[in-house]
């Protein structure tokens, strides 16, 4: 899943027999350094190193170095926040998957942005990293951004509908996520849209799931909104 933030990694490395114990000790030192760096953020962080059988094939040194350099140089994380909404991410990328198998290496990155020009800028920077490493780069699965409109008529109408139904105004947020509204808006420019739904738990992880008790509230809100929407 390119959408999931990486949380685990496994790699086989080869070293001279005389250096094995030093490498095992170094891994332990790295674990402690990372535990200190990510204290209170990643409580369960752990490293494990063990002897395994010598692999049948190894990545040639030049290709290995180019690949590692490209991964290090590849932009990852937040690129920019929305200028008018400083606490909300506008553009980012996720270096999600690195695979080496059957004589080939593949790196998968997901870029998202509410602004198309910034998404293209980030994609070009990523493409440059791997092109310079001699890798073939493809772009696929792109979807359009959706810029927030605080003056949206449907937003105003649904805020009032929510207040009438539940006795309080809803908490309206701009989120950094790929939404269907971006795809629809690219096909029907100028369409007034809003995105809402039941609560999602553990987003951007393999455990992402819907909070079932929130579905009934979402359904009631949706039907009430439709009932109060005037016909055109």
PLM features: what roles do these ranges have?
Residues 15-20, 63-72, 79-81, 120, ...:
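His/Asp/Glu-rich mid-to-C-terminal helical/loop segments that flank catalytic regions of hydrolases
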Residues 1-112:
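Midchain, well-structured core segments that form catalytic/ion-binding scaffolds
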Residues 90-103, 166-225:
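Zn-dependent metallopeptidase/amidohydrolase metal-coordination segment
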Residues 13, 45, 135, 168-170, ...:
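A structural micro-motif
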Residues 15, 19, 59, 83, ...:
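Catalytic cores of large soluble enzymes that bind and process phosphate-bearing ligands
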Residues 4-10, 58, 147-160, 183-187:
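Short glycine/threonine-rich loop-to-helix capping motif typified by GTGT followed
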Residues 90-177:
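Substrate-recognition/cap regions that form aromatic- and gly/pro-loop-enriched pockets
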Residues 22, 26-37, 125-133, 153, ...:
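Generic non-transmembrane alpha-helical segments
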């Amino acid at each position: 899943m390119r959408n999931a933030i990486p949380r685990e990694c496994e790699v086989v490395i080869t070293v001279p027999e005389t250096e094995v114990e030093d490498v095992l000790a170094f891994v332990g030192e790295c674990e402690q350094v990372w535990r200190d760096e990510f204290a209170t953020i990643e409580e369960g962080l752990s490293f494990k190193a063990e002897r395994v059988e010598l692999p049948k094939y190894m990545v040639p040194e030049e290709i290995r170095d180019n690949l590692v350099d490209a991964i290090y140089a590849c932009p990852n994380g937040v690129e920019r926040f929305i200028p008018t909404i400083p606490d909300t991410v506008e553009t980012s990328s996720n270096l999600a998957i690195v695979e080496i198998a059957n004589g080939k290496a593949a790196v998968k990155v997901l870029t998202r942005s509410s602004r198309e020009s910034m998404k293209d800028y980030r994609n070009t920077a990523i493409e440059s990293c791997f092109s310079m490493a001699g890798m073939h780069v493809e772009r696929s699965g792109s979807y359009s951004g959706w810029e927030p409109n605080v003056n949206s008529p449907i937003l105003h109408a649904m805020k009032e509908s929510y207040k009438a139904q539940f006795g309080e105004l809803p908490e309206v947020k701009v989120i950094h996520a790929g939404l269907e509204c971006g795809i629809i808006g690219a096909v029907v420019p100028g369409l007034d849209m809003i995105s809402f739904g039941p609560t999602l738990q553990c987003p951007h992880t393999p455990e992402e799931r819907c909070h079932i008790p929130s579905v009934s509230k979402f359904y009631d809100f949706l039907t009430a909104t439709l009932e109060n929407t005037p016909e055109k």
